[in-house]
Amino acid sequence: MGVIQAIDRLMTNPIPDGQVDDILRPQGESPLLQKGYVTTSVDALLNWARTGSMWPMTFGLACCAVEMMHAGAARLDLDRYGIVFRPSPRQSDVMIVAGTLVNKMAPALRKVYDQMPDPKWVISMGSCANGGGYYHYSYSVVRGCDRIVPVDVYVPGCPPTAEALVYGILQLQKKIWRTQTIAG
């Protein structure tokens, strides 16, 4: 039996007496059998690929970085979500800013962000990265990394748990699913 015949057998209607289930298998031939390929919107395909292979770059500045390392350890296993930490901004599409951002580090954060290829996303992890946190009134602290780079997801906590970071990453995946990449 050839490949097309096997696919045809799988694509035929499983409901008896010739009834057609319009939701699962619409009436008529499938595009795969007619033309040999399946069509989908390019946005859906790109977003599926992007959510399945997010490569974050760690920008650990303080104690939140320890929880970020904990999220990448064996207990939570970010690899099952297709998330692999990358050492270089040119290889990553997500930046996780974890910890207190001081004024001297702000230009370096922006420089690293600018080196990332498009499309790029930022997760702000912890109270200090979100809004200055405990050091909010210090003269040397940036009151939120969103003043330097655009932030897509905020993960609250001091420090946030590794589970909270995983939840934030899953929220970013949902946000990526909803984006429209190609102007239409």
From Swiss-Prot:
PANTHER family: NADH DEHYDROGENASE (PTHR11995), NADH DEHYDROGENASE [UBIQUINONE] IRON-SULFUR PROTEIN 7, MITOCHONDRIAL (PTHR11995:SF14). Belongs to the complex I 20 kDa subunit family. This is NADH-quinone oxidoreductase subunit B. InterPro entries: NADH_UbQ_OxRdtase-like_20kDa, NADH_UQ_OxRdtase_20Kd_su. GO terms for molecular function: 4 iron, 4 sulfur cluster binding; iron ion binding; NADH dehydrogenase (ubiquinone) activity; NADH:ubiquinone reductase (non-electrogenic) activity; quinone binding. [4Fe-4S] cluster binds at residues 63-64, 128, 158. Keywords: 4Fe-4S, Cell inner membrane, Cell membrane, Iron, Iron-sulfur, Membrane, Metal-binding, NAD, Quinone, Translocase, Transport, Ubiquinone. It is a peripheral membrane protein. GO terms for biological process: aerobic respiration; electron transport coupled proton transport. Its EC number is 7.1.1.-. It is found in: Cell inner membrane. It catalyses: a quinone + NADH + 5 H(+)(in) = a quinol + NAD(+) + 4 H(+)(out). Pfam families: Oxidored_q6. It comes from the Bacteria. The lineage of its organism: Bacteria, Pseudomonadati, Pseudomonadota, Gammaproteobacteria, Lysobacterales. The gene is nuoB. The keyword Translocase applies.
